[in-house]
Amino acid sequence: QRQMCIRDRGMHVTYLDPSGSQIGKKESIPDTARVLGRMFDGIEYRGYGQEIVEELAKYAGVPVWNGLTNEFHPTQMIADMLTIREHLGELKGVKFVYMGDARYNMGNSLMVTCAKLGMHFVACTNPKYYPNKELVDYCKDVAAQTGATITLTDDVAEATKDADVIYTDVWVSMGEPEEVWAERINDLKPYQVNTKAFENAKDSAIFMHCLPAFHDLKTTIGKQVYEKFGLSELEVTDEVFEGPRSVVFDEAENRMHSIKAIMKATLSD
């Protein structure tokens, strides 16, 4: 999708995969950043540690875009907020419920974004999966200035009452040990987004997911989960995913528009 966005804007793209890059191995991140900054007009990093993309940005001398790290996913946030505006008309005051594992890039980024935009963010999950306290405290400080609220709860009925948006992300990833899958699935089963989760939400409430989603048996992971745990759906049911509240494909399209806008804004004189 990113390569398509670049080409659509009349630019040229070079892709460096992990096996083709010596970043942080044979060559330090500051050195790599300065070399790439002499060769390219912009750099997108999609990888692991947040500190890597921040160090690239410090030394590159050209725009550096965070395509995703373990901690944050800012380009997805622009797409998500655009999608909410398209369907609900405004952002400020929106009650946004995130169900599932809220410890990583999506939970973190959505909480920060909601805090900055005056939205009411609710992380609804097993307390083991709450965002880290330091980030929660930061978001509460921001929320005090914007009129936002930050709530952490394990009560689905309370969390989803009058919700405008219910959002989730995958619980498991390829390559993780089976025992990790088992623990996470067991802990997060009560926080599956299903029709019951929408019973207390507003009639206009929408369902969002950054994709990919495990809502049926048409994927390798979906089949593996069914064989090992007997579940045909994970973080969201097929009924919700394919239902009238779901805006996930508008959301996916909006990543393209958002990435183009970010590139134009940061590369323009």
Regions found by a protein language model. Give the residues of each.
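C-terminal helix-to-coil terminal segments
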Residues: 224-269
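Anion-binding alpha/beta catalytic cores of soluble intermediary-metabolism enzymes, centered on
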Residues: 41-113, 209
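Rossmann-like dinucleotide/phosphate-binding beta-alpha-beta segment
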Residues: 93-153
